[in-house]
Amino acid sequence: MSDEFYYGTGRRKSAVARTRLYKGNGRILVNDRPFEEYFPRPTLLAIVRQALALTKLEGRLDVKVNVAGGGMTGQAEAVRHGISRALCILDPELRGVLKKAGLLTRDSREKERKKYGQRGARARFQYSKR
């Protein structure tokens, strides 16, 4: 990998992905492992590839990602968000395509907290009439 890179930070739920794009031949490393090995499900692989496929840069860039926190899906979506942001820095012309696909928007949905006096965030304790 060359020294010049483009940086982007992606977030989803509690996952944070720090992404670097290098000129290369399409290799994607997540936490120093090939992404096919790190994300075992085909749906997650598709999520990670989505931004590169949309911009037709799949075989031309190497991606190096450090991701922490959250679960597998949250991490995959954080990686996608980070790659999308880095692509905007690489080529500002791509912003419109990525924005239209919704890849630059931070998905702000978070887990709602459990409230006291209840079983969960919304669920109440069972009510007994008698």
From Swiss-Prot:
One GO CC term on file: cytosolic small ribosomal subunit
An annotated GO BP: translation
Annotated stretches, region: Disordered: 108-130
Keywords: Ribonucleoprotein, Ribosomal protein
Tagged with keyword Ribosomal protein: yes
One Gene Ontology MF term: RNA binding
Top-level taxon of origin: Bacteria
Entry-linked Pfam families: Ribosomal_S9 (PF00380)
InterPro entries: Ribosomal_Su5_D2-typ_SF, Ribosomal_uS9, Ribosomal_uS9_bac/plastid, Ribosomal_uS9_CS, Ribsml_uS5_D2-typ_fold_subgr
HAMAP family per record: Ribosomal_uS9_B
PANTHER family given in the database record: RIBOSOMAL PROTEIN S9, SMALL RIBOSOMAL SUBUNIT PROTEIN US9M
Family statement: Belongs to the universal ribosomal protein uS9 family.
Name of protein: Small ribosomal subunit protein uS9
Organism field: Solidesulfovibrio magneticus (strain ATCC 700980 / DSM 13731 / RS-1)
